[in-house]
């Protein structure tokens, strides 16, 4: 199991969360709004980051190359997958090009067609699509079962038993 950080970033206005646009300087963004995400990525190594619905400086979070590539991936060193909140994608092709890996709640036939047509028309490079897919494969590898469940349960029973004996 792994953690998913949300909602990346500047998600502070629930009333206008789907249409809001947080206009913020790069300095304030780094010093105030991104600092906790950076710490969580560097220390906690989450499996996923979920984008917020809102825009930051006129670009939706799910399509924001500055937030997803420059800051999250390049500066913070995030290696997991970036996903939208439910219905949080506005331009599927732009989102894939700018750092999104997974659209929630899932991929419909309509969305597959949009991506396929973008590749066929040269609007989305195959390399960009591969780059979007690789983090999902990495997370899948991280979650592979490494031990038998029974062995893990026996380990936990032993460790739970020992402190319990002290209270008897």
Roles of regions detected by a PLM:
Residues 1-168:
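Glycoside hydrolase catalytic-domain context in secreted enzymes
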């Amino acid at each position: 199991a792994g953690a998913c950080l949300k909602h990346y970033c500047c998600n502070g206005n629930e009333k206008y969360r789907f249409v809001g646009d947080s206009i913020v300087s790069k300095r304030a963004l780094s010093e105030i709004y991104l600092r906790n995400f950076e710490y969580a990525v560097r220390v906690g190594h989450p499996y996923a980051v979920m984008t917020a619905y809102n825009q930051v400086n006129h670009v939706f979070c799910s399509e924001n190359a500055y937030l997803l590539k420059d800051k999250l991936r390049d500066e913070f060193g995030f290696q997991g997958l970036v996903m939208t909140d439910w219905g949080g994608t506005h331009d599927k092709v732009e989102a894939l090009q700018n750092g999104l890996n997974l659209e929630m709640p899932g991929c419909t036939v309509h969305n597959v067609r949009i991506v396929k047509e973008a590749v066929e028309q040269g609007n989305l490079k195959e390399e960009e699509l591969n780059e979007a897919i690789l983090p999902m494969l990495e997370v899948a590898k991280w979650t592979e079962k490494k031990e038998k469940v029974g062995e893990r349960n026996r380990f936990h029973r032993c460790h739970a038993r020992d402190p319990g004996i002290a209270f008897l």
